[in-house]
Every structure is written in C-alpha cells, then in structure tokens.
Amino acid sequence: MPMISILCSLFPPLLFPSLLAAFGASIAAGIIGSYIVVKRIVSISGSIAHSILGGVGIALWLQYQFNLPISPLHGAIASAIFVAICIGNVHLKYHEREDSIISMIWSIGMAIGIICISKLPSFNSELSDFLFGNILWVTPQDLYFLGILDLFIVATVSICHTRFLALCFDEKYMALNHYSIKTWYLLLLILTAITTVVLMYVMGVILMLSMLVLPVSIACRFSYKMSHIIYIASILNIVCSFLGIMLAYLLDLPVGPVIAILMGGAYSLSLLLKRSYNASTPSPVSPESKINS
C-alpha cells in the first residue's frame, strides 16, 4: 500500500512498534477526549491519569519483590478503573465536591506510586519513563494488550455514541427515556480510565492531558458536529505523535514532552487561523456549547 511504503521510507523499522502504539493511542484520545472536554470532566480525567502512577508503582514493586508476572500495564489499568469507579460513585451517590475528591485521589495515587518506585533499584529511569513517557520501550505483549484496549474503546463508543451525547448535553432526556445516568456516566469514566492507560505509553502520566484536550480544543474551533470533532482531533493526534516520535528519535529527546510541545504549537497556530477564518461562518463551537452528533 502507498501509505505503508511512505511510512517505511520515513521511519526506521525500529520505530514501527512505537508508531503502532501511537496510532492506537491517538484514535482513543481523539474519541474519548471529545466527550470529556464537552462534558467538562477534564479535571476528573487528570485525577485518573495521575492516580495511574500508584498502580504502576505497586505492580513494579510486586514484580521486583516477589518476582510476580505482573506488568506495569496491568497495575495501571487496575488502578485507573478503580479510581474512575470511586470518583463516579462518590460524586453521584454522596454529592461530594468534585474538586475535593480529585485532590485527594490525585495526591494519594502519586504518593503511593512514588513510594513504591523509590524502593526499586532503577528508581530514576523507571519514574522518568512513567512520568514523561518513553514509547520506545513498548514490548510486543504490551502492544497486543494496547490493541485490545483500543478496539474495546472504539467498539463501545460506536455502539453507545447516542447515549454519550445525551449524557453530555441532555440528562433530562436520558431520565425521561429511563436510561440510567449513573451507568452511562461510570462507563464514560471507565473508558476515560482505559484511554489514560493507553496514553501513558506515549505521553507519560504528567503530559497525557495535552493529547486528550488540546486537539479537541483545536477541532472545536472549526466544527459544530461531534463526529467531525472526533475525526479532526484523532488526525491531529496522529500527525503530532508521528512527528514527535521522529523528532525525539533524531534529537535523542523524550517522546512525551516533544509531542506536548507540538500540540501546544498546533493550538497556537489554530488561534492565528481563527482570525483569518471566514467572517460569514458562525462562531466556532466552544467546549461548553451544544454540539450536534
């Protein structure tokens, strides 16, 4: 295929596993990022993302201390889903302030992770990889697992897209049609948790929100339709990720920060393009505005 030939000519074979992981992460981030920006739960996503470090640290410690066959990816997915369910239930059932819950979980998750990783002989390198991303250490087993997670996200959203739109824009409609708001809200948080685990391999724990939020914010400037926003955000993620991997490889830099800088540059460019946008076109949609499906 022409596209594969182009990629083979541009990227060395060593980077192909990293490119596959970045492609899957870009699709997941473009899809889920669109919902969390419109639903205004970016801060919750940040809490889930940072709490991953706790699961990663526990998995690495168990692996080192007891020689258990536990991957950091397994610890990350378990902690992310657990935190997502906890945040959702506390918010919906007890109506506690979200900012208080987020602050508590954010700090506890990071603290547990740092304590566990500090007990490892390779503390600095492991911590740097998970905080700032190092997609070059993706193994074939991790790649298969990431592919399964990505397919699950795409399949679930394809089936439940209408319900998620109603959750984001019209919860009264869901209640009138006897749909469980709690169930769909928790499902969205779980999908967000899975997405953050996928992004951990590309961006690291600290910088993954830039891949979730910035491309969606750019797309929202130029389209009303939710489906268009998802497509644009996914394409922007793919372009910035591939370019970031190549630049990081050539310049011997960490991948996550390079991609984050490219995302920031793309967002700044969108601000300039916004000024030259056709004046007769209605104002682009904002994350808070109602978006059509």
UniProtKB/Swiss-Prot annotation:
InterPro entries: ABC_BtuC-like, ABC_TroCD. Pfam families: ABC-3. Belongs to the ABC-3 integral membrane protein family. It comes from the Bacteria. SUPFAM superfamilies: ABC transporter involved in vitamin B12 uptake, BtuC (SSF81345). GO terms for cellular component: ATP-binding cassette (ABC) transporter complex; plasma membrane. Coiled coil: none annotated. GO terms for biological process: response to zinc ion; transmembrane transport. This is Probable metal transport system membrane protein CT_417. Part of an ATP-driven transport system CT_415/CT_416/CT_417 for a metal. Keywords: Cell inner membrane, Cell membrane, Membrane, Transmembrane, Transmembrane helix, Transport. It is found in: Cell inner membrane. The chain crosses the membrane at residues 18-38, 41-61, 68-88, 101-121, 135-155, 187-207, 242-262. It is a multi-pass membrane protein.
